[in-house]
Amino acid sequence: MSSAGVPHTDLWPLLLYFELVLVVVGTMLALPPFLGERRTRRTPATEQPYESGIVAVGSSQLRFSVRFYLIAIFFVIFDLEAVFIFAWAIAFRESGWPGYIEILIFIGVLVATLVYLWRIGALDWRTPRQRSIEATIHQ
């Protein structure tokens, strides 16, 4: 074996893998038009959502408040940070005092973020109109 380059005999697994990836991707792109759903005619029954045999009442398109998505994003962010805290708890003995100080800073940032979100009203589910009505009632 020469030190000038990689011998060609060592590259065959990589080339085979590349060719197989191309075949799989090509197959995945080529087959859907042949295997997919074909709609030849549209009827009112095919346009309705399937409700397990129950006649649909009203629209199947529900409108959710943007606040719902905002709360969901906050939940995902804080849940992910909880995973980091669990990982720190597993390595608690190995990290020592520096790790303890770092997790205190991390939790402090979490608490500061939560207080900030609470103060600006991002966690408040009420609309501005509901808040103003409540403020006039409590005066």
UniProtKB/Swiss-Prot annotation:
Top EC class for this record: translocase
Protein keywords: Cell inner membrane, Cell membrane, Membrane, NAD, Quinone, Translocase, Transmembrane, Transmembrane helix, Transport, Ubiquinone
EC number: 7.1.1.-
Reactions it catalyzes: a quinone + NADH + 5 H(+)(in) = a quinol + NAD(+) + 4 H(+)(out)
Major site of localization recorded for this protein: membrane
The keyword Cell membrane is annotated on this UniProt entry: yes
Topology with respect to the bilayer: Multi-pass membrane protein
Parts of the chain that traverse the membrane: 11-31, 70-90, 97-117
Pfam families: Oxidored_q4
One cellular component (GO) term of this entry: plasma membrane
Compartment(s) where it occurs, according to its Swiss-Prot or TrEMBL record: Cell inner membrane
GO molecular function: NADH dehydrogenase (ubiquinone) activity; NADH:ubiquinone reductase (non-electrogenic) activity; quinone binding
KW Transcription (keyword) present: no
Similarity field: Belongs to the complex I subunit 3 family.
UniProt-listed PANTHER family: NADH-QUINONE OXIDOREDUCTASE SUBUNIT A (PTHR11058:SF21), NADH-UBIQUINONE OXIDOREDUCTASE CHAIN 3 (PTHR11058)
Protein's job: NDH-1 shuttles electrons from NADH, via FMN and iron-sulfur (Fe-S) centers, to quinones in the respiratory chain. The immediate electron acceptor for the enzyme in this species is believed to be ubiquinone. Couples the redox reaction to proton translocation (for every two electrons transferred, four hydrogen ions are translocated across the cytoplasmic membrane), and thus conserves the redox energy in a proton gradient.
Subunit structure, as described in the record: NDH-1 is composed of 14 different subunits. Subunits NuoA, H, J, K, L, M, N constitute the membrane sector of the complex.
Protein name: NADH-quinone oxidoreductase subunit A
Organism listed in the record: Methylococcus capsulatus (strain ATCC 33009 / NCIMB 11132 / Bath)
Upper taxonomic lineage: Bacteria, Pseudomonadati, Pseudomonadota, Gammaproteobacteria, Methylococcales
